[in-house]
C-alpha cells in the first residue's frame, strides 16, 4: 500500500518569515523526521502576486507573504533537502486557502480506498483544514489523517478548533 503525504504551505514566510511561529518550526522538525517514509509527497505553496494587499485576503490579513518567486514563497529547505527517497514528488501552487486540484488529482492518482492520505502543515485553522475538507469532499470513502503535531495554527485555540472540525468530518487526527 502506498503512503501519501500532503504538506500544506510549509514555506519560509510561514515558518521563519513574516507569519512564522515557534509552533511552525516544531511542526517542520516533526515533518522532516518522517518525510522520507512516504512514496508520494505533495507540497502546496501559498502563492500571491505583488498586488496581494489589494486582494480580499490582503485586506483581512495585511501582511505580505508568499509573494511568488521570493525567498518567503519557497518551501523550507529542511523539507526540500529531505525528500531524496520519495518516489513521487509534486508541488501545487494555490492562490487561496484550499485548492480544487484535489478533484482532478483524486481522479488521476491511482489511489485505492485502502490507501491513507495524510495531511499536515500550516496553518491548521486556515489552509490545512480547508484542503482536508476539500479532499474529503472529493474522496468521501478515503481514509484521511491529519498529524496534529505536524501542524501549527494561528493560535493554540484555533489549531485545536480546526482539529475538532476535521474529526467531525471523519478525518482522523493522529
Task: Locate each region found by the language model.
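Histidine-anchored nucleotide/phosphate-binding helix
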Residues: 30-38, 129-139
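Active-site acidic carboxylates
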Residues: 1-91, 154, 160-168, 172
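A short glycine-rich beta-strand->turn/loop micro-motif centered on a GG-aromatic cluster
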Residues: 118-123, 141-156
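Internal catalytic-core helix/loop-beta-alpha segment
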Residues: 69-126
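Short, surface-exposed amphipathic charged segments that create phosphate/polyanion-binding patches used
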Residues: 106-110, 159-164
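Active-site-proximal beta-strand/loop segments in catalytic clefts of secreted hydrolases
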Residues: 44-47, 95, 122, 149-150
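Short, well-ordered secondary-structure micro-motifs
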Residues: 53-55, 102-104, 130-131, 157-158
